[in-house]
Amino acid sequence: MSLARPLLSGVVTCFNEERQIRACLESLAWCDEIVVLDSHSTDRSAEIARSFPNVRFLERTYYGAAAAKNFALDQTRHEWAFILDADERCTPELRAEIEALLAAGPACGAYTVKRRCYFLGRAIRFSGWRNDRVVRLIRRGAARHANARVHPRVVVQGQAPTLRSPLDHYMIEDFHEYLKRMVKYGHWGAAQAWRDGQRASSFADVLFRPAWRFFRTYGLQLGVLDGGVGIAFCLCQAFATYAKWSLLWSWQLDAARGRSPQLPEFDEREETWRGAVPAAE
C-alpha cells in the first residue's frame, strides 16, 4: 500500500508531439490530474491527450516556454505540480521517490531532477549534458519560469534540492527532425538576443561561436567519449549556435538598411523575455 500523500498535478506542454505524448502521459498516469497545454497542434497530439481519463486538455498560442509553463501551472488544482516536456518520461524510481517525499512532508518548495538524455536512441553521458538538471517538482507559488522563449530559467523561493532518481529525456529519434528543431531554436534564440539588445560584434561571431561550441562540447566536455553519436550531437549543438548568430548578423545588416527584423510573436501583456521591460498593466 502506498503512503498517503498530498494530491499532485502533472503538467505537460506540447506542440505536434503525437510520437511522444502517449508515453509521456503514461509515465504520469499516477498523478491525480494531468494538465496538458497544447499550442494548437496540427497532428494527433490533442486526440491522444484527450484519450487519458485524468487529463485536462487546454489550448493556447505559444509565446515561449516560460509563458506556457507558467500558464499551465496556474491551471493546476493541487498544491504540488510535477512538470514534464513531451519528450520526457517519469521513471518508476522517480515516481517512488516523489511520492515518498510528498508523503513525508517536503522541507522545500521546489525540487530539481536529474535527466538521463538520449539522442537517436543512444544515451548521452557527456557532450555538455553530463550534469543536466531541471527544476520540475514545484509547490504552488514557490517558483516561476523566468521569461525566455527557449530553455527558461526557473526562479525559486529558497532552495531546490536535487532528487536522487532521474527522469528520461528522449531528445530526438529522427536526425532530420532534430535539425529542423535546431533551426527553430536558433530563430527564437536570435529573436530573444535581439530583444535583449545583444548584437554580433562582427561576422567573426558567426564563424567562431559555432566552432567554439563544438570544441567545448566535443573536447572539453568529453563528447568524444559518447562515440559516433557524440560527434553528431555536438555538431547539432554547433549548428544551432550558427543558426542563431547568422540570423542575428543578417538582422543587423537589415537594420543598417532601415529594415526591421521579423521577430516571432511576443506576449506583450503577460510575459517579458529576459532583459525586456515588463509591459504596463
Over which residues does each language-model region extend?
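Residues at the starts of beta-strands that form the adenosine-phosphate
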Residues: 7, 32-33
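Short acidic donor-binding/metal-coordinating loop in glycosyltransferase active sites
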Residues: 39, 60, 78, 85-88, ...
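Acidic helix N-cap motif at the loop->helix transition within catalytic regions
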Residues: 19-22, 43-51, 93-94
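Catalytic-site signature of metal-activated, phosphate-bearing donor transferases
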Residues: 66-73, 79-80, 91-255
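Alpha-helical transmembrane segments and their immediate juxtamembrane flanks
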Residues: 257-281
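N-proximal low-complexity "stem/linker" segments adjacent to membrane-targeting elements
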Residues: 1-27
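A conserved acidic beta->alpha catalytic loop
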Residues: 27, 38-48, 62, 85
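Conserved donor nucleotide-binding strand/loop of the catalytic core
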Residues: 46-77
